[in-house]
Amino acid sequence: MELPSLIRSLTLIDDRRNNKNKRYPLPLLLLIAFCASISKHDSWYTMQDYALAHEASIRELYKQLFGEELEHVTPSHDTLNRALQVIPHKVFKEAYQNWIANLLQWDEQTRQICIDGKTMRGVKKLSPDTESHIVSAYDPHLQLVLSMDAVPVKGNELDAIRRLLDELDVTDALITIDAIGCQHDVAEQVLEAGGDYVLQVKGNQPTLLQELEDSFPNISKGYTVNKEEGLEHGRIEHRQMKSVVLSPEMLDDSYAFKDWAGIKSIHRITRKRYDKRQGKETTEMSYYISSIEDSKRIFRAIRDHWKIENQLHYMLDVYLGEDGWSKRAGGGGHKHGAHGQNRSFHPTASKSKARQVDSTSADVLSQTQSSATLRTGAIVRIMRQPWCVCPFKRTCKRK
């Protein structure tokens, strides 16, 4: 199957500039911004340097993609700034949605959406009221960000979770959320949308947590156990999950479980970690409720939920330096943060950034066919980055 070109999708963006002084076409500016950004150039100045360093390659690539040979392909940092900052970030998001909509194929047996938040610390330091906390919906199997929402502080994360569930197509998906999402209305919202849930239970639901802590020691039969062992970062970790499918008796008025919509099973995970260096062993327990009974799927889903930290948040911090981003013109920090996950647009105009040029994006985009579509290998390398944004329910169709 021929895959659509990401770069061609960007040409759907309207050029909002005045008809005068259009020396550089908008697709060229977008192409330079995209190539430079995935090579970790996050200022207008380093983008200008990137275009100068790869002038011949950019000219040839533009000709392959758009069938036009340009005389000038090295815009100044001011030109890039003025042309791209006036475009709303939602327009960029829609361009990615149009591109990825044709690529997705859901597996209804394993489909999972992890929801979690991350604070952009550089933005928060400038203003406590800035929308610095980004809540993301992430597919750990496709390794794609499905959507995101920005809120001022972590305390508002629950509102963002509700909005994400409302705009995403969660049909047949297993939604995993940490304790902040363990709310009655969240569970109901997931079920009404055609999905299922696995919610972690902590102190924000004291009655439910106490019920779980009291129930498991008294359960001597009718339960299943899933185990796993691993060695990571010098620690040996044993994970064991004890699962119980709720009987009709456990859903009567004498138990707190009856108040949770669609609840079918409860789970306790015991994690024992042995630090080889320090010679210390620690044990912790965590509790979960779910609207499905398949304990093996739940055990794997809880484990995969951590991929939003390991694959997305870690990538944003370590490789893309998200915590160093600050408030910017043309929409503020949350606007840039939302596109830190597609990492292509609205970079800072700070001169303090070192001007470094590399050829990462040139290597990726050199795999371009004459038909102006990216090769499968290049598409996979691009779509598996945390800056990709996936379609909302109105455009995301399972195939």
Give a label for each model feature.
Residues 187-195:
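Short, surface-exposed basic-aromatic patches at helix termini and helix-loop junctions that form
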Residues 329-340:
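Membrane-interface transmembrane-helix boundary segments in multi-pass integral membrane proteins
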Residues 1-114, 123, 127, 136-148, ...:
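Dynamic "connector" segments at or just before major functional cores
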Residues 32, 47, 76, 113-118, ...:
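Short, conserved catalytic/metal-binding motifs centered on acidic residues
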